[in-house]
Amino acid sequence: MAKLDTLKAALEKALGKRVQNLVEATGELTLIVKADDYLDVAQILRDDPSLRFEQLIDLCGVDYLEYADGAWDGPRFAAVSQLLSVTHNWRLRLRAFASDDDFPVLPSLINVWNSVNWFEREAFDFYGIVFDGHPDLRRILTDYGFVGHPFRKDFPVSGFVEMRYDPDQKRVIYQPVTIEPRELTPRVIREDKYGGVEH
């Protein structure tokens, strides 16, 4: 039995109906679970002797608005975790979709894998995914006064405000964005004997 088949069978046996979907692509398995089962599944993935995913390597947020060809009709926001079992030499991708697109909430995995701390803060900062139960869920990379979540696909490229140093006030201030849309039409300059041809 192939390694992925063994892992797939172990996941189905340990998790049962909690498995919403198991996708195999490019030699890796992705386990998709409901938001309500997310925390319980994580606990089982870590503690079940047949699985033993001791390490969470990464977690990131994903915005599925306008996904692929635009035909996505599922929930908009997901948290995707990369897990590693040192015991069994397995890798697994765990994905859970937040049920509310306007206020995405998922349970925090900090009591299962404490390495998720800053990853969840980053997903909150960039995507606005709230991780319920996180002890210090605040912005980690953007400024504290930042408006919005910059990795959301509907966030404007130019942003809402810009910061600059004001020499009169001797401090950094916020002001509305002053970037104006530009028309990027190339300007053609002809040279008289370009390429040896008279123009």
From Swiss-Prot:
Keywords: Cell inner membrane, Cell membrane, Membrane, NAD, Quinone, Translocase, Transport, Ubiquinone. It is a peripheral membrane protein. Gene3D superfamilies: NADH:ubiquinone oxidoreductase, 30kDa subunit. The keyword Transport applies. It is an enzyme of class 7 (translocase). GO terms for molecular function: NADH dehydrogenase (ubiquinone) activity; NADH:ubiquinone reductase (non-electrogenic) activity; quinone binding. Disulfide bonds: none annotated. Transmembrane segments: none annotated. The keyword Iron does not apply. It comes from the Bacteria. It holds the Pfam family Complex1_30kDa. Its EC number is 7.1.1.-. It catalyses: a quinone + NADH + 5 H(+)(in) = a quinol + NAD(+) + 4 H(+)(out). One of its GO terms (cellular component) is plasma membrane. It is found in: Cell inner membrane. Belongs to the complex I 30 kDa subunit family. NDH-1 is composed of 14 different subunits. Subunits NuoB, C, D, E, F, and G constitute the peripheral sector of the complex. NDH-1 shuttles electrons from NADH, via FMN and iron-sulfur (Fe-S) centers, to quinones in the respiratory chain. The immediate electron acceptor for the enzyme in this species is believed to be ubiquinone. Couples the redox reaction to proton translocation (for every two electrons transferred, four hydrogen ions are translocated across the cytoplasmic membrane), and thus conserves the redox energy in a proton gradient. This is NADH-quinone oxidoreductase subunit C. It comes from Cupriavidus taiwanensis (strain DSM 17343 / BCRC 17206 / CCUG 44338 / CIP 107171 / LMG 19424 / R1) (Ralstonia taiwanensis (strain LMG 19424)).
